[in-house]
Amino acid sequence: MMYQPELETLPREKLRALQEERLKRLVAYVYERVPFYRRLLDEAGVDPKGFRGLEDLPRIPFTKKTDLRDHYPFGLFAVPREEVARVHASSGTTGKPTVVGYTKNDLKVFAEVVARSLAAAGARPGMMLHNAYGYGLFTGGLGLHGGAEALGMTVVPVSGGMTERQVMLIQDFRPEVISCTPSYAQTLAEEFRKRGVSPEELSLEYAVLGAEPWTEAIRKQVDEGLGVKSTNIYGLSEIIGPGVSNECVEERQGSHIWEDHFLPEVVDPDTGEPLPEGKVGVLVFTTLTKEAMPLLRYWTGDLTFLTYEACTCGRTHVRMGPILGRTDDMLIIRGVNVYPTQVEAVLLAIPEVVPHYQIVVRREGTLDEAELKVEVSEPFFREIGQEVLSDEVVEADHRLHALRERIARKIKDNVGVTLKVTLLPPGQAPRSEGGKLRRVLDLRK
């Protein structure tokens, strides 16, 4: 099923023509309404009256997160604050949040693209969605909620946390679809396993997972643990929120970007030059239809690639690959380039832990010191019978001590860097208010 089949299957030449028209209109719109963009375009020598559309797009400088922070809170709004129907904000690692505004029409588009995404993931009108994304300033909860209602679903707005209650509601209400972070889906699967509830006893059929990077190994764990087909939903609050793209349940080989609203590019992280199809680079978006806070060439920092290969689902919109990392997530520790995904691959091969972790880097004098905080699995935690996992407890328990040493050794062998390993009880890895795992904390900056 498709939510908007005519738009989702638009022939590429018609889709490109629509993008051309909307891009030209957007450049004129922000030039007139947003002083920041007027200065940016003037300095780049881009005149909206002579702007030729897609071929001129690379002439426009990138918009970066620092630009949003420099104009906090409402300096990039293109409409009077009174015309803004809703404000969301993403929690930054430091300082003020990144604020995004939405007009009533922006919220309508938001609901439509999420409805498209849910339908691509297998959801249908009349199904029930157990929405375990956080509600509030974080876009996840309200974003999925609005899209599900637009699709005609029944929404259970359970939000994040309270795992025991979530387990009860899933068993009692019997929803067909769940939306949450991949790590929380793993938590729920483990909780059902602990209670002796098999996947076959659950009503769940589809899981819509996002808000943090995940791997095919995690997908396999979730699919088997909950008895679902899980798809990736991608988005970021600066662009609109969740629903910028979603995998189709037919292939699950890349997420369809809704290109009539979000114009994607992949560029070289060092030079900023556009890269051809299939090459990995930084994902950049231009919002073609946003009214309250449109963005030109927004640098997401996410590393991925694009493919225009035809999809068996029939959708014509370009697909993006998985997020392979972030330009700001790569850590250089004592001269070694370290990506969180490398560490995660090691952890996935160790059954006593789960890939819920944080890498913390500090500077001690002139040297970098790195710590890996990682959760042990529920079964292992029960087996060792400890209430806390302090350094003293780990040193005294030969199983914990051996596990800590094994993790450190495998990371040294596979990643090439020595990390101090700290074992955490289940559920104790640092998370943001929206429930997202915070994989990297670089305290050297």
From Swiss-Prot:
Its EC number is 6.2.1.30. GO terms for biological process: phenylacetate catabolic process. It catalyses: 2-phenylacetate + ATP + CoA = phenylacetyl-CoA + AMP + diphosphate. Pathway: Aromatic compound metabolism; phenylacetate degradation. Gene3D superfamilies: 3.30.300.30, N-terminal domain of ligase-like (3.40.50.12780). Signal peptide: none annotated. Optimum temperature is 75 degrees Celsius. The enzyme is heat stable. It comes from the Bacteria. Pfam families: AMP-binding, AMP-binding_C_2. Belongs to the phenylacetyl-CoA ligase family. Monomer. Catalyzes the activation of phenylacetic acid (PA) to phenylacetyl-CoA (PA-CoA). Involved in the phenylalanine metabolism. This is Phenylacetate-coenzyme A ligase.
